[in-house]
Amino acid sequence: NPNGPNTPAVSRSWFRRQAQATVQAAHKAGRTPWIMPQCFVDVWGPWKYDEHLNALMLPGSVLHWRQPTVGEIRWQVWSAIGSGMRGFFWYVYLPPAADRPEAKPYVGSTFPPSLAVKVPTPALGPGGLLKPDGAATPECRAAAEAFAAVRPLLPLVKGVVPADSPAGKVS
């Protein structure tokens, strides 16, 4: 994304900082902290759904936002809970209802023309936690599994306030 963090390390750092700031603001206001992690694909230019209902970038398009991997979805859940979040709602649950195979190829200054795909290229997801037909994606199942793993821990985390800064760093 040209409007935010681009490397995985910078993106994770940004997510944690924003989660911590949200938790602090919610606690200061006497509110329960919620977070809205992203799980979508944003293709600029022509694209269509393939036979598995995943987005397929067509020649002339660029990938503006990519859908998080299954591992990144799990990480979003656990990292947010570790920051003190107590609620989640995802952006987005349902991907676009209709693809855009007839869209004009990307033209602009945000991305260099060399980033436009030359051949149909998978965007690695439908653009939401669910597919256009309402079926769960692997990312949706990963979020559900993470929430199921958290459930037995709820008595331990309810009422816990996170430390001001991380106790350590794992790289």
Regions inferred by a protein language model and the residue ranges of each:
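Aromatic- and acid-rich polysaccharide-binding/catalytic face
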Residues: 1-13, 76, 83-91
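Aromatic- and carboxylate-lined catalytic core of secreted/periplasmic carbohydrate-active enzymes
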Residues: 87, 91-171
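Intrinsic disorder/low-complexity segments enriched in polar/charged and small flexible residues
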Residues: 46-49, 77, 92
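Well-ordered, non-membrane alpha-helical segments in soluble/globular domains
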Residues: 8-22, 66-74, 139-146
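Aromatic-lined carbohydrate-recognition surfaces of secreted/lumenal glycan-active proteins
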Residues: 14-15, 25-44, 88-93, 154-168
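Active-site clefts of carbohydrate-active enzymes
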Residues: 21-71, 98-101, 106, 122-132
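A structural motif corresponding to the C-terminal end of an alpha-helix
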Residues: 21-33, 79-86, 142-156
